[in-house]
Amino acid sequence: MLKFYDKTVTSRLLIGTALYPSPAIMQDAIRASGAEIVTVSLRREAAGGKTGDAFWKLINELNVTVLPNTAGCRSVREAVTTAKLARELFGTSWIKLEVIGDNDTLQPDVIGLVEAATILIKDGFEVFPYCTEDLTVATRLVDAGCRVVMPWAAPIGSAKGIINRDALKLLRDRLPDITLVVDAGLGAPSHAAGALELGYDAVLLNTAIAKAADPVAMARAFRLGVEAGRTAYEAGLMDARDFASPSTPVVGTPFWHAVS
């Protein structure tokens, strides 16, 4: 079981709702993933009209928890305003907070992120901040009141997997009581498994599933990858070594020489 603020879930895979070939495929992929939490962009819903209504109907049919996001926001003011609109529209105090600082890498503006998180938490929000793997930034977010922190593995949509494993491991070691979710940059189920093997509580992704040749099958693959990674972490992974260590004993009499 896993807790996000006061909500308990069983799935450690969170997925986005954008970029799918069709709404029907999106719905089937979410079901196949087993995800209980999906991210939704306010900008998509705010467009309104029949398209927005149809999308919202599909989401409601899935019986999942919606995590609105502030995707595309590039200032503290814009992110805070978007979060407040999302709370009104979706009826939730949850917000996946994004404050983008660079258009090419979509790297978070971590200074603005901490400022926006502080403002929103004081206003009663439960913030899921998208950040880099920087320990100081994560610590500042926790000090501001975030009980969930979501560092990236790599730039959004890059599919590179975990670039700075040591930094992510340090975050896990230093923030043992915080729910940590690897968010962005995962491209393969093995990447998700690796994040869970590090002790991360969950992963959030979108493009790797939505842009796969078969999004539904890929969603199922990520579900299995997450389950495998968590099981491996709980089982206790052996430590890596610099030198070989024989797995077969070489001391004693060979079995074919033993006297019965």
Curated annotation (Swiss-Prot):
Predominant location category: cytoplasm
Signal peptide feature range: none
Superkingdom to which the source organism belongs: Bacteria
Pathway: Cofactor biosynthesis; thiamine diphosphate biosynthesis
Alphabetized InterPro entries for the sequence: Aldolase_TIM, Thiazole_synthase_ThiG, ThiG
Catalytic activity reported: [ThiS sulfur-carrier protein]-C-terminal-Gly-aminoethanethioate + 2-iminoacetate + 1-deoxy-D-xylulose 5-phosphate = [ThiS sulfur-carrier protein]-C-terminal Gly-Gly + 2-[(2R,5Z)-2-carboxy-4-methylthiazol-5(2H)-ylidene]ethyl phosphate + 2 H2O + H(+)
Biological role stated in the UniProt entry: Catalyzes the rearrangement of 1-deoxy-D-xylulose 5-phosphate (DXP) to produce the thiazole phosphate moiety of thiamine. Sulfur is provided by the thiocarboxylate moiety of the carrier protein ThiS. In vitro, sulfur can be provided by H(2)S.
Family membership: Belongs to the ThiG family.
Protein name, as recorded: Thiazole synthase
Organism, as annotated: Bradyrhizobium sp. (strain ORS 278)
Native organism taxonomy: Bacteria, Pseudomonadati, Pseudomonadota, Alphaproteobacteria, Hyphomicrobiales
Gene this chain is encoded by: thiG
